[in-house]
Amino acid sequence: MVHWTAEEKATIASVWGKVDIEQDGHDALSRLLVVYPWTQRYFSSFGNLSNVSAVSGNVKVKAHGNKVLSAVGSAIQHLDDVKSHLKGLSKSHAEDLHVDPENFKRLADVLVIVLAAKLGSAFTPQVQAVWEKLNATLVAALSHGYF
């Protein structure tokens, strides 16, 4: 279990309060699919993902980005037990979707980039450190179903 200080929880809540789930989710998932094109194989039902314009204009990418960030938001509401909270999602990604767990880290990394671009100078090294701790917690919880 991860220990969160009151300050860390406040930082996460502050950053999350500035997140536009629909737009930032779309931006993060689009960036993942463009920067790591091999991840597109998990989204074959999304249609054309052949270039940046196709990815960024794809309504299924936008909807799934929203779904992903909604899950992050839900996990944030359960910081003291993220692993249990994400157990079902971990299991489905491992057993049904066969997603390489390294892709959770990649998505977490692109989300940091999206948030840093959005928040600018407010995304301080201290904020990034807390967000990286959150990402590590989320990635570990999502990867748990694989081991």
UniProtKB/Swiss-Prot annotation:
GO terms for cellular component: hemoglobin complex. It holds the Pfam family Globin. CDD domains: Hb-beta-like. InterPro entries: Globin (IPR000971), Globin-like_sf (IPR009050), Globin/Proto (IPR012292), Hemoglobin_b (IPR002337), Hemoglobin_oxygen_transport (IPR050056). It comes from the Eukaryota. Heme b binds at residues 64, 93. This is a larval (tadpole) beta-globin. This is Hemoglobin subunit beta-2. It comes from Xenopus tropicalis (Western clawed frog). The lineage of its organism: Eukaryota, Metazoa, Chordata, Craniata, Vertebrata. The gene is hbb2.
